[in-house]
Amino acid sequence: MSTRLGSHTSPGIDYPDRDGQPRSDNTLQFQWIVTIKEGLEALFRDRPDVFVAGDLLWYPVEGDNKTRTAPDTLVAFGRPKGYRGSYRRWEEGGIAPQVVFEVLSPGNRFGELLRKFKFYERFGVEEYYIYDPDRNDLVAYRREGEVLVEIAEPNGLVSPRLGVRFELTEDSFEILGPDGRRFQTYVELARERDELQTRADRLADRLRALGINPDES
């Protein structure tokens, strides 16, 4: 069960839950953010010690409400699930999110990307993934000591923390769970559910035609 975690922030300093920036610049970017975030939520649904969030402000330093950023998706291992207005590291056992994703849009500027890269490198992110849906391009970084190092070939890469595999073709990008199932959009999941229900209904009709009641155990 999800709960809202209590706040233990020192009085006198305000840590806003919003930074005034839009959640996404276009529908394609938003679709990918939701697909990645919800796919990871589903993947770790039985792990109470894995917290996944989208567009949540992360404050790494107590007493400093200016140093902050909001990853499109973050994953923090060793932290309980629950509702948060922001991710304040000093209230999270000193644990920084280990994995972050950014989904680019035409509005993303180089300066903003550089700022975020330096932020993630400085504050302990282990894996950093940047996907550009317009160019169908993936850039991946992995921590080596104190720095984030770019992975030369991200296609086929398996995330050490998440256990997911990234597959790039000329015109598509797929994230595959450890079971090989692709992360899907809500529409794709709904369509799959409807197809399964249709098959189940047809099977039930065949059983009834044979004089078997499928509703009886």
Region annotations inferred by a language model:
Residues 25, 30-43, 51:
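A structured, charge-rich N-terminal accessory region that forms the first stable segment of a protein
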